[in-house]
C-alpha cells in the first residue's frame, strides 16, 4: 500500500477519532447520566438548545463548539484529499515528494485539529490554526499540480 493511501486511511481514522473521543463522549456522557435528554441534540441546533448551549459555553468556554467545528473541518477536507488519492492511484503516480506532501498534510491536519479543540480562540491560536490549515491546502494543491502535469505530458 502506498503512502498517500495510508495517509487517507489515517485521515479517516483521525476524523472518526475526533468524532468519537470529543463529540461522542461529550454527548453520550450527558445523555447516559441523565443531564440532558436525547432529544436535546436537535439537528437544527448542532450544540443543543439555546439555553443548554449558553450553559455549555459558560462551563467550557466553547470547548464543545470548537470540537464540533474541528470535526467538521476534517469531514469537509477528507473528500478533497480522497479525490487527490483516487487520481494518484488511477494514474499510477508515486514519488517521494508525493509521499512527503501526504504525510505533511496529515500532520498539519492533526495539529490544526488539536489547536482548534485545545486552545480558546485568540488571535494567536487562530493564526496558528490557520497556518496549519494553509499547510494542508498547499500540500493538496502541490499534489494536484503534480497530477495535472502528469496529465498534460
State the predicted function of each range.
Residues 1-47:
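N-terminal signal-anchor transmembrane alpha helix
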Residues 14-22, 80, 108, 112, ...:
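Alpha-helical transmembrane segments of multipass membrane proteins
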Residues 72-87, 140:
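Core segments of transmembrane alpha-helices
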Residues 84-107:
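Short alpha-helical packing/oligomerization segments
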Residues 143-153:
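Juxtamembrane boundary at the C-terminal end of a transmembrane helix
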Amino acid at each position: 500500500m502506498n503512502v498517500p493511501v495510508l495517509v487517507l486511511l489515517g485521515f479517516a481514522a483521525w476524523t472518526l477519532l475526533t468524532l468519537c473521543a470529543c463529540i461522542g463522549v461529550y454527548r453520550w456522557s450527558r445523555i447516559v447520566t441523565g443531564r440532558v435528554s436525547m432529544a436535546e441534540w436537535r439537528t437544527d441546533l448542532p450544540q443543543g438548545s439555546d439555553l443548554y448551549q449558553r450553559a455549555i459555553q459558560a462551563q467550557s468556554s466553547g470547548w464543545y463548539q470548537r470540537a464540533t467545528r474541528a470535526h467538521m473541518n476534517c469531514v469537509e477536507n477528507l473528500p478533497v484529499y480522497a479525490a487527490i488519492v483516487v487520481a494518484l492511484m488511477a494514474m499510477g503516480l508515486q514519488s517521494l515528494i508525493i509521499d512527503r506532501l501526504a504525510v505533511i498534510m496529515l500532520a498539519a491536519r492533526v495539529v490544526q485539529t488539536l489547536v482548534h479543540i485545545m486552545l480558546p480562540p485568540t488571535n494567536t491560536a487562530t493564526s496558528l490554526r490557520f497556518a496549519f490549515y494553509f499547510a494542508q491546502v498547499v500540500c493538496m494543491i502541490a499534489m494536484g499540480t503534480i497530477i495535472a502535469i502528469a496529465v498534460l505530458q
